[in-house]
A protein has these predicted regions:
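Thiotemplate assembly-line natural product biosynthesis machinery
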Residues: 1-16, 67-77
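Glycine-rich loop motifs involved in handling phospho/adenylate chemistry
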Residues: 20-32, 53-61
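Conserved catalytic core of two-component sensor histidine kinases
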Residues: 35
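Major-groove DNA-recognition helix of helix-turn-helix-type DNA-binding domains
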Residues: 49
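C-terminal structural segments of small proteins and small subunits
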Residues: 52-76
């Protein structure tokens, strides 16, 4: 989780990603941010995020996003 938080903080250091639960809904993460984030996650965590999983509820919080990463990683094993 800390690795993900580091990535998010690099993008928006002013945001408290440990508490924020509406990153997409409140416009903290815009579409370009999400594209960059997906690229970094795929590189750092060695996963591929399927297009069907690129939905706001997976990107509204670091916790939800990390749960998605873990689920994908488990499926790949």
């Amino acid at each position: 989780m800390e690795q993900l938080l580091d990535i998010l903080r690099e993008m928006h250091p002013e945001t408290d990603f440990e508490r924020e639960t509406r990153l997409v809904d409140d416009g903290v993460l815009a579409s370009f941010d999400i594209v960059m984030l997906i690229t970094r996650i795929e590189e750092e965590f060695d996963v591929v995020i399927p297009a069907k999983d690129i939905v706001p509820e997976h990107f509204n919080s670091a916790k939800a996003l990390y749960a998605l990463i873990e689920r994908i990683a488990e499926q790949d094993d």
